[in-house]
Swiss-Prot record:
Protein's recorded name: Indole-3-glycerol phosphate synthase
Family annotation (Pfam families): IGPS
Top EC class of this enzyme: lyase
Source species taxonomy: Bacteria, Bacillati, Chloroflexota, Chloroflexia, Chloroflexales
InterPro entries: Aldolase_TIM (IPR013785), Indole-3-glycerol_P_synth (IPR045186), Indole-3-glycerol_P_synth_dom (IPR013798), Indole-3-GlycerolPSynthase_CS (IPR001468), RibuloseP-bd_barrel (IPR011060)
Amino acid sequence: MDTMLNRILAHKRIEVERQRIKTPYDQMRTRAETAPPPRDFGAALRAHHPIALIAEVKKASPSKGVLIENFDPLALARTYASNGAAAISVLTDVRFFQGHLKYIEGIRALFDRGAAPPLPLLRKDFMIDPYQIVEARAYGADAVLLIVAALDDETLAALLALAGDLGMQALVEVHNADELRRALAVGARIIGVNNRDLHSFTTTLETTRHLAALLPSENRPLLVSESGIFTADHVALVRSWGVDAVLVGEALVTAPDIAGKVRELGGRL
C-alpha cells in the first residue's frame, strides 16, 4: 500500500545509508559514548503536575506544509524551557518535516551553556536503524521516538535496548491495540499514543481514550498523548483518561503568543 508512512520509510532507508557512508558507525558510536551524559526524560515527565508538556520544535509537516515562516529553533527552545515545558521534542527529518539534527545539537549547546533551563531532548524521527540511535546520542539527544508501525518486533526490541545501553529512554509510539500490545511486550516504559493515523493522517483524540483503558494497572508505563491537542480543554480531557504528558507542536508554533500557549497547555496559567 502506497501510504505517506511507507514513502517516508523508503526515503529514510536511503538517507540512513548516505549518513553511514559520510560518518561510519564506529566513528558515530565513539561520539555517542563520549557525549555529555543524557538527561532523564521520564523523570522530567513525572516531575510535572498536573500534566507534563513535551513542546515540539517543528517547522513543517507533510499534511500542513510550513507552519512557521520565521523559524528559529533556538528561540523556540528557549521560550519552551522558560515557560514550563517538561521536555522538548525536536523533529530531525529533513525531507518531509524540514527538521535537522543540527537543531538538537544547537539546543543542547544552548542548555549546556546555561542560556535556558536545561530540559531533556527527544529526537523525533522515523527511527529504523541502530545507526540513527547512536547518531541521536552523538548529537545530544536524551530520548528517541520509536514508531511501532514502522518496525518489526525484533528491530523494535533491538533499538529500544540500544537506546538504553547509551543511557537514553524511548518514547514508543502506538496507534492501535495491537501496536500497544507489541510495545508492552518489548518492555516499553513510556508509551506515546499518536492520535493521528500515520497511513491516512486523520486525527481523533478518541484513540488516546481507547488505548489508555488497555494499559495495565500494575507497573503502568508513562502515557503520552500526541497530535490533535490544541487547547487547555483538550489537555484536561486526555488527562481525565489517565494521560501523564502531552506532546504538542503545531498548536505552539502557530500560536500568536507562543509563551502563553506553552503555559496554557502545560497547566501553568
